[in-house]
Structure formats: structure tokens, C-alpha cells
Amino acid sequence: MSLTDQARAAEKQRVQEVTEKIAVKITELEEQVGLVQSDVVEIRKHYWDEVTMDMSTAEDAVESIASMRQQSEVLSERERTHRQASKTLGKLRRLVQSPYFGRIDFIERGEREEEAVYLGIASFLDEEAGQYLIYDWRAPISSLYYDFAPGEVAFATPNGTVEGQMVLKRQFVIRDRHIHLMFDTGVTIGDELLKQVLSRSSDAQMKTIVATIQKEQNRIIRNDSAQMLIVQGAAGSGKTSAALQRVAYLLYKHRDKLSSDQMVLFSPNPLFNHYVSTVLPELGEENMQQTTYQAYLEHRLGEMFEVEDSFTQLEYVLTRGGLDHGSEQTPVMEETYEARLSGIYYKSSTAFLAIIEAYKKQLEQMGMLFNPIKFRDKEVLSAARLVERFYSYDSAIRLPNRLELMKEWLLEQLELFAEVEIEEAWVDEEIELLSSDEYHRAYIRLRKMEGGRDSSFDDYDQERHLLARTVLKEHLKPVRSAVKQLKFVDMIGLYGQLFRERAATDKRELIAEKPRYWSEICGRTLEELAQARLPYEDATPFLYLMEAVCGFQTNSAVRHVIIDEAQDYSPFQLAYLKRLFPHCRMTALGDLSQAIYSHASAYSEIDPIAALYGPEQTEVIRLFRSYRSTREIVEFTRGIVPDGDAIEPFTRAGGKPRVIQTSDRGSLHSLLAAEVARLLDEGYASIAIITKTASEAELAHQALTPLLQAPLGRARHPFVSGEGGRIRCRTPL
């Protein structure tokens, strides 16, 4: 149904009226927040002026405590009021820019007049008229917008079910107090591009196509049964858009038990995280947690290794280890490349995961490796002594539990060592270097030991013993800290042991079928470990082994994980994520045709990823219609990818792609420069030159910069370790 000019004018007028009322409320609230803030500052400033402190008698003490409590309660009330008013003010400031995004007209059964209900991120009441101008998207009546098309509808309220008829469903895109898009629809459209299509077109066939696309996406958005939902979709089919709408829907439907910080999105790269934070529907909530898999690896392993990122690995694979870019090819270089490729395949597979699980079982009986406990270049406990102690425990005790027992034993051994070490000459030398503050703290401890009696350092032996313990405690602190973090376990040695010919474990039982170039794989792995470098294909197996031995740091608070571009994850990585989040559901979005890491992808077949939760708990949804590119582009690209005939193009016309073959790089660069100049003349503000590899991009930048008058952008976006890999928990791990 096409909107009339009269309807459009009425909606524009309403937006103006509503935003004006919100602006008035913002002004009032800003004044209120300012006054309350002044109250808080004044109360804090004169807090003790208003409190009478007299502890001379028990009665006076009680009155003093009551006076303090009363003043504290006044301060707490003002602070609560300030926090709540500031929170409301923040919502109103967002609301005034984009007051609502939906409208439904509803006639309750038995009534004659229809009610227009506008939905936004928060409710807004016109206090003079006593009427809600905007309803919160979480209000009971809002479910009509998400769950129904126009027609017979019903929604649940605390007082029972309300039935009636929805006569209109209208969607808006309002920014900066102006309506950008507006259209009537039968289904709720969440994708921005589809909104634009519906807003600009009155063609019935186009509306039918868009409605069909949204219904397909709704199967993804509203799926609430599958433990693992796999979405296989062509490029531009709206997988990510559907996933973001799915987040919105799940937060809405389970708003009483699911919050945004219990959802995690693993996105392809840090730039995508910024994009996602701007596209989530207007929920009035914080965004869900977002990270990249690389950032998580950096967070967990960055202190131990220089961790290779996936793009560096990919660059190596695509350039054949540099063989494709001018290097003189030799049989040794070719073999090195093939060996690395074989290692990537092998270490990314579930077969290698099974080997590590078997290796863990073997370590319960034999093969554990430990670092000796050292202090000031002195070996306190040898690695052999630690191995002996470890295998003295009951073999039925799990590895992580045995290590906890080892930790407690080691801390006890350090206490015994300290009693002997206290007599060493270096301790007296350190005592001489103690500051007056450290002497004073030791004196305070002595008073506590003496039960509060006034004491002095008259006894030299007592003084020396107390100060020596202070010195030893400080110097042993790093050793104790390392023990508490289980750093006495030689994890690098344990992982490397898998690749050593002579090892304390029987690898014949573990690795029955060795991959090609096994000897070269072993040599390269050990060499990288010795240099404190961890290739990307080793990062997840190393982390998995570390957690299998020391105890998994599972995150039980997260309830839903969304993996975008899942085709770029290996089977091993997906299995690790399942182990990391044991109580969550998972949504995996990907496209077999877009697997940039096809040498190690779980999406090379659907079966490995579907096997994570089993067929009973897994559902696969396939999207075939690509609507983000023109028909001509889709028809061109579907001729390149396997099974491309199944991809359906959208009815958007455009120019045909051109394939130009040149005889040499010089001709290529001249043609590119001419094409860029033409596009700039036509007014294009942003032009991208896409290459297969980073080295090709570097080459293109060097060649094109002298040929172009306009500046050619050049930026790198490396992975950043640290906070990016942290995943918050509502409850302790």
C-alpha cells in the first residue's frame, strides 16, 4: 500500500510535535540534574559539618552513629536521584533525534475507535494530556509489531490476553528529527537496504519480493529451538543483517532472563566491530559484547608468544610463501611451502583435536613436563622432583585437580625453603637497605604479635627475624605468584613433545596416520616454539592443550554466541568455542563460496560444524537470494563460484562488470590510474582498489601513487591485543 501525501504530511507534523515536547522535557530534566548534582556536591563538601561525633559515653556514641547514618542516607538518596535522572536524560537525548521506529493501529475487540501506537527505545508520556506519545518496544502491546501482520491479533498482559485487529503496520527511519524512510508493510523489515527499497518503490511485485526476503530472514531471526543454527547464504543475502535482527529479537523475547552482556559476537575483524555497534536496532540497551577470535587468542597467549594472525597466515598461503612474487623458486622452498600447508590442514582438523584429547589421557600416566622452581639462581625444586610428586597422586584424579594439589604443595615447600634461606648473608644485606617506612611497618606487625603491648626492637634476634621475613616475603612474591598461575607447568615443552621424535610419551598410539611432510612439520613447529613465536595454526591447539591440562576457563555466563563469517573458522576452532561457552546456543553465519581460509575451513563441508551439537540440535537454513549487488554483478559472480546457479539475483539493474586482461603490470597500472581518474571526475568520493594479497596491494600503492593527482589512501589495521579479547561475565568463572 502506497502512502498518500496527506499521510506523509501528518507523520512529519507528528514527528515535529513529539520532538518539541521531548526537547522541553530535556530542558526541564537538565535543570533538575544540575540542581541535584549541586546538592550532592554540597552534601559531600559539608558532610562532616552536619555530623555530630561524640564518643565519650555509650549514649553519645549511639547518637553519633545515628547522625552519621542519617547524613549518609540523605547523600545516597540524592546520588540515586542523580543517577536515575541522568539515565533518563540520556534516553531522552537519543529519543529526540529518533523518537520511534514503528507504528501499529489497533482496535481492541468490542471497541470502535482504533488506537495508534508508536514504538521507540523508551516510553514518553505527555503529562498534560495524560497520553503516551511513544511506547517502549518492550511493552506488552509492542509484541504486535514484532509478531503479527495486519489482521486478527492478540497480546498478553498481566491482566490477561487482549484480542483485536491490527489495521496498519508502518515503519520509519527517523534521524536528526526528520523522517528519512517511511512505508507500510505486512512484515517487520529489519534490513536497512530493504527499507530503502520499500520506501522508494510502490511496485507491487517489488514489495512481494522484499516481503519474501524478510520472511526468509525471519526463519533465522525467530528460530528459538536450535542449539546450533547454521546459516549458509550467498554473498549479499543478508546473513549478518538477519543475525543482528536475531539479537534484537532474542533480547526482546527473553528480556526477563537474557541481557546484552550475555551475548557475544565473534566478528571477522576489528573494523567490523565498529560497524556492528552502529547497526543494531534501536533497542535502548547496551550493545552485546564483540570481539575477534584473533583478539581472544592475543589476550590468552600474548604474554607467552608472538601470535601470528590469520591474515599473515593467509598471505603466506596465497603468495605460496613468497614464491609468486619474484622469488627464485627452488625445490627446497616449494617443499617448505607444501609442508606448511600440510601442517595447517592437519592442525586445524578435528583429527588433531582427538589426538590432543588422547595425549591428555596419556599425560595422566606419563610424560608430564615441569619447569624447575628457582630463586636467585638457586634451584629450590628440580623438574624431576616435580614429576615424581605429580605422579605420586592417585591416577584417578584429573590433571587440573592434581595441579591444584601440586600448587598447594609447592607453596608449602616455599615456606619451608624460606625458613632455611632466612639465615643467608644476602638477607642481612637487604635488611640494611630497608627504608624507614618498612621498619615502621615491621614495628606495627610486632605490636600485633605482642597483643597490642608497647614493644620496641630491643631484642636483636627478634628484630632481625622479623625484618628478614619481610625481605624474604617480598623477594619470594614473584615465585609464589608464578606458582599460583601454574607457570611451573612446562606448557611449551608439553606441546612441543607432540612433535619430538624422542619424547616421554608413546606417540605411536597417538599419531597413527602421519600427514605428508611430517618431519618438516615437526621441525618447523619446534623451531617456532623455541623463538617464542606461535603460528596461527598452532594457537588454538596450544590453547586447548593448556586448558585441558591446567583446567578450562569456561564462561558459563554467556548464553548465546554468534559467529559471523564462520566459513573462516577451522573445525578445531569451532570445537574450542563450544568448549569455552558450555551453556550457550550458537548461531554460525557463513558462505562456502566466501571461505578465504578454504585450506582449513569447517565450512568446506557443513557436516563438521553440524556435528558439534549433533543433528537433533542443529538446524541449517540456506539463503539463495543476493540483493546487495545488482543483477549484472550477481550473474557474473555466480558463474565463478561452485553451484552458483542456485544464487538468485535481485531485480536491481546496473552496468555489467568488465574483465580486462593486460600483457604486463605497467599496462595494468596505467589502465587503473585512468579508471580512477575517470571515477573521480564523475564525482565518486571513495574508490577502492581490491587485490588478492597484501603484497599486491603494496605493489599497487607504490605504482599508482605517482600516476594519480589525488592522494591514494594507505592504512593498516592490525589486530590489537589486550582488552579486545576480554569477555565479561556476570558471574565469576
Predicted regions and their residues:
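Alpha-helical nucleic-acid-binding subdomain
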Residues: K253-V561, D568-Y576
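Short hydrophobic beta-strand that contains or immediately precedes a catalytic carboxylate
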Residues: I213, I562-I563
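Short, flexible loop/turn elements at secondary-structure junctions
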Residues: E108, A235, S267-P270, Q567, ...
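Conserved motor-region signature of P-loop NTPase helicases/translocases
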Residues: Y118, S123, Q165-P268, F272-T278, ...
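Short, charged/polar micro-motifs that form catalytic or ligand-binding hotspots
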Residues: G90, R94, S199, D203, ...
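Extended, charged low-complexity regulatory segments
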Residues: M1-V210, Q214, N218-R219
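Conserved helicase motor core of SF1/SF2 NTP-dependent helicases
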Residues: T278, E282-E286, T291-A295, G302-Y316, ...
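P-loop NTPase Walker
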Residues: M1-R44, D191, Q196-G326
